[in-house]
A protein has these predicted regions:
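Periplasmic/cell-envelope proteins involved in peptidoglycan metabolism and beta-lactam response
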Residues: 1-306, 319, 328, 403-415, ...
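Beta-lactam-recognizing serine transpeptidase/beta-lactamase-like catalytic domain environment
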Residues: 71, 193-204, 245, 250-334, ...
């Protein structure tokens, strides 16, 4: 009996000891968690019971050179519902259906869904949001947001660009200067129960967003509007495919206007222009049969094998392209300015040198024709430029030779991109030096068999007429802080010593005679010395008989303050650059030279040597 009692006592002590050890372990673990891991579990609890919603920051504005707003913000609302807080569901459903123009069944689905918060509609007009807020219905949230707004509609659409549904830039300056414009979002912190549903009575904590900075650009609305009207007019008159006009300051690279018609509506960027919509309709859409198992738009295919959605996206991408910098073309005779500058700089030609044009030039086994098949006869170099004579410039190219011509091509910056502050700039398409023969050299010398962008041509010619400084064509000028105080000035690279001052002066003088006495006479303006060069180039394939008519001009010729380039794609009827494109630049210059404060002067003494 005594043995049994002793045995039972031992068992009790063992159990008691185990319990003590377990309690000690539990208390120790509890002390450890409460004292040493409290921060971790506090954060975990907060994560479970707090919900964070973003408050979008107001995006910075884009302003033109004179302070006119080109891109701004409109206040819109996001309407949401919180299931647990709704007391009158039928009233909520009826109100939201009426005000938001949404089917009641769709609203009911969101109202009856058990979730922390359910968005009913975004981008609601502020007036509508205010009306819903005034009804003070429990469980209905009205949060203010921002939507990008473009006061000038389609003006400079391919330059300014637009934003997406998340208010982030997609194309143009909107995406290039995203970090400056976007601002810093704020937060709304709310407390939720175990199911993740917001607890209304506990309120919410807000962190205010920081507004984005604004961007001042060199583009001038008045100049852009006039240039855009001029482009539309000539496009309609000549039934052209498209027209591009670039106007920039050759001294500092600031771009005053960049026109690419047809433009598109920045406030409705996903709707095709009429001509592109016609292309979509003509692409041969095949409607699926009634028993087709694909009900989405993706099932609808065009005759090209692409879905309707894919084809539309292709056309949208085409509509958004900026041909002045996204597309390359054969510049034709405007490129003779580059050959002229290289020849003068290298000393292989001078203004008084004599040439003979029989209407063609034989290079190796090829006869390369002049635009004037009967020939220009005997002429000096200046007259060759006035006549836009191909054999003269072929001869200058051959005198330079492949090695030197390629050297100047590189020295002038033509093998590099300009570095302009718009995304998607295309590079030059040029023969490799090792693959160039004399025939290729001959065709390059008058602007054929290679391709560059319009902005590249404008930047290169600027460096040849401004004294030899390679400026970067750009739009960005300065940044404004949210409080409208001036922020940083935007600075772009400048490269010195492209050509000598003497060569630059000779180029200006020769090009002035092209307008005053030669093929560019349709750009002449009384009282102003205008320099320029015409071009008429045939697109590939040559057999299609499609042309690009262009004119590059600058003023005043003695000290250029503005350079203009007009390119007309596939004009109908008369297609010569001097006849079609030169008058466009003349009309623009007549209008904007006084606007820029450039006064008329005596131009009688401004002439080229040897002419």
């Amino acid at each position: 009996m005594k043995k049994n009692m002793t045995f039972h006592k031992r068992k009790i002590w063992v159990v008691l000891l185990c319990c003590i050890l377990m309690m000690t372990g539990l208390i120790g673990r509890l002390v450890y968690l409460m004292c040493f891991r409290s921060d971790y579990y506090y954060k975990k609890a907060k994560e479970l019971h707090e919900r964070e919603r973003e408050i979008k920051a107001a995006r910075g504005e884009i302003l033109d050179a004179r302070g006119k707003v080109l891109a701004s913000n409109r206040t819109v609302c996001t309407i949401s519902v919180i299931h647990s807080q709704i007391k009158e569901p039928e009233k909520v459903i009826a109100l939201l259906s009426e005000k938001l123009k949404i089917d009641e069944a769709e609203v009911r689905k969101r109202v009856e869904k058990i979730s922390s918060i359910e968005i009913v509609k975004t981008n609601v007009e502020k007036s509508t949001g205010d009306e819903i807020r005034e009804c003070s219905l429990a469980g209905v949230k009205v949060d203010e947001d921002y939507k990008r707004y473009y006061p000038c509609g389609s003006l400079a659409s391919k330059v300014i660009g637009f934003t997406g549904g998340d208010n982030q830039g997609i194309i143009g300056l909107e995406v290039k200067y995203e970090e400056i414009l976007r601002g810093q979002p704020g937060k709304i912190l709310t407390t939720t129960d175990a199911r993740g549903v917001e607890i209304d009575k506990l309120g919410e904590t807000r962190e205010k967003p920081i507004e984005g900075k604004s961007l001042i650009i060199s583009l001038d609305v008045n100049i852009q509007e006039f240039a855009q009207q001029s482009a539309l007019k000539v496009m309609e008159e000549k039934q052209a495919e498209r027209v591009s006009i670039l106007l920039m300051n050759p001294q500092n690279g600031e771009i005053y206007a960049c026109v690419n018609v047809p433009e598109f509506d920045l406030n409705d960027p996903f709707t095709l222009t009429d001509d592109l919509n016609m292309q979509l309709n003509e692409s041969g859409i095949t409607i699926p049969s009634e028993d087709h198992n694909e009900q989405s738009e993706l099932a609808v295919q065009t005759t090209s094998g692409k879905t309707n959605t894919e084809r539309k996206q292709e056309l949208l991408n085409q509509m958004w392209r900026n041909p002045c910098l996204n597309d390359t073309y054969e510049p034709g005779s405007t490129f003779k300015i580059i050959t002229m500058a290289a020849g003068l700089e290298a000393g292989v030609v001078s203004p008084g040198d004599r040439f003979y044009c029989p209407g063609y030039k034989v290079v190796e086994d090829r006869r390369i024709h002049c635009a004037k098949r009967t020939g220009h006869g005997s002429q000096n170099f200046v007259e060759g430029a006035q006549n836009s004579c191909n054999p003269v410039f072929i001869e200058v190219g051959l005198r330079l030779g492949i090695e030197r011509y390629y050297k100047y091509f590189r020295q002038f910056g033509l093998l590099d991109k300009t570095g302009t502050d718009l995304p998607g700039e295309a590079g030059t398409i040029m023969h490799q030096k090792k693959n160039m023969g004399e025939v290729e050299l001959a065709t390059v010398s008058f602007g054929q068999s290679f391709q560059i962008t319009p902005v590249q041509l404008a930047a290169t010619v600027s460096s040849l007429i401004n004294g030899g400084r390679r400026v970067t064509p750009h739009f960005g000028v300065a940044v404004l802080n949210p409080d409208r105080t001036e922020g940083e000035k935007l600075i772009f690279p400048v490269k010195e010593g492209i050509v000598s001052e003497e060569t630059s002066k000779e180029v200006r003088e020769i090009l002035e005679t092209v307008v005053s006495q030669g093929s560019g006479k349709n750009a002449k303006i009384e009282g102003y010395a205008i320099g320029g060069k015409t071009a008429t180039s045939q697109t590939l394939p040559r057999s299609a008989n499609r042309y690009i008519s262009s004119f590059l001009g600058f003023a005043p010729a003695e000290d250029p303050q503005i350079l203009g380039l007009c390119i007309i794609h596939d004009p109908k009827g008369i297609y010569y650059g001097g006849t079609v494109a030169a008058p466009v630049i003349r009309g623009i210059f007549e209008n904007i030279l006084p606007y820029l404060g450039i006064e008329k002067n005596d131009v009688s003494d401004f002439s080229a040597e040897g002419n």
